[in-house]
Amino acid sequence: MMKSVVLVILGLTLLLETQAMPSSRLSCYRKLLKDRNCHNLPEGRADLKLIDANVQHHFWDGKGCEMICYCNFSELLCCPKDVFFGPKISFVIPCNNH
């Protein structure tokens, strides 16, 4: 009995101390805007690039073209492009990562 209690405690301790491995799959997240205004984006934000002049309030997040952010009132909602647009049309979204 005592041996099983010690094993359970040891197992729980190891489980709690072990850091979880980050998932390789990207997920959605939110970014709050300091000035609560979407109209002056991406001024002052080098990490945001407008996708296209015809696609208002949508920005590439970061250096690549995997994450898309949508400016919604006082926050940015950022998701992988496949989640945002769907896998059937996400490949036609223009990406200029220069």
UniProtKB/Swiss-Prot annotation:
Its main location: secreted. GO terms for biological process: mesenchymal stem cell proliferation. Glycans are attached at N72. Keywords: Glycoprotein, Secreted, Signal. It is found in: Secreted. It holds the Pfam family SCRG1. GO terms for cellular component: cytoplasm; extracellular region; Golgi apparatus; neuron projection terminus. The keyword Glycoprotein applies. Residues 1-20 form the signal peptide. The keyword Secreted applies. Belongs to the SCRG1 family. This is Scrapie-responsive protein 1. It comes from Mus musculus (Mouse). The gene is Scrg1.
